[in-house]
Amino acid sequence: MINELGIDLQVNQGQCSWAQLTEIAHIAENNNYQTLWVADHLSGQVMNAPSMPECFTLLGALAAITSTINIGPLVANVGNRHPGVLASAAATVQNISGGRLKLGLGAGASPTSTFAAEQLALGIALPATMSERHAKLEHTLDVLDEIWSPTRDEKFATFEMPCKLPPRIIGVNSMALAKVAGARTDGVNIRSSHPQRAEILRVAQDTATAAGKSDFIVSVWDWFDEALLDPTSAGCKELASEGVNKIILLMRGVPDAKRLAIKR
């Protein structure tokens, strides 16, 4: 597993203007944040925002104005797009960015969740059970593998192919999906405050180790806290003891440029 503790930044793009996002992207790039993440939502309502710029469209724009920082969705909801459309969108961003995409993927919310309101408003049917949502995510992984394969079927010959395969990281809340992450992808992500964080991350890491992966990404997301910018802090040491090698910090509202501009 990767041992270095990396620090990433996530923004809620629905609460930012394009000018603000441009400024934040440059600050993050110039202050050693490894990846700039955006959300994948269709409605601003579920993120307390007045609107919500589309995820991959925004990532393409961010790719064009940056040169070194990685970019990605945390996480792309597999219920929002046909997997073939997701493959095309992700490959396009990967190529615009010159290979800087990190592809976060998620199974999506229950149809009874408040987060499902945006899909229901558009008439997008959501799988009723967790196992069905997990199966949909695995089907998406299958389609990505098929379309991006160097030996892909001739029918995909002129579909966008990424310049290199983007690392895939699954956002999880359960042991079951942690096993999928460890077995089939390049990383796992979980909310730092999840009550079973350590156990779920251990399952993902053990599964990845059994699959022969030595560079598995073990990440958590948390609200922005300057203390977590210091790898010697108690919080960072606790996470590192659980195998975490990446912290993704989400700032509420419009990111504060002064708080972000901390050389590390």
Explain the meaning of each model-derived region.
Residues 1-264:
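Active-site-adjacent structural elements that line small-molecule/cofactor binding pockets in enzymes
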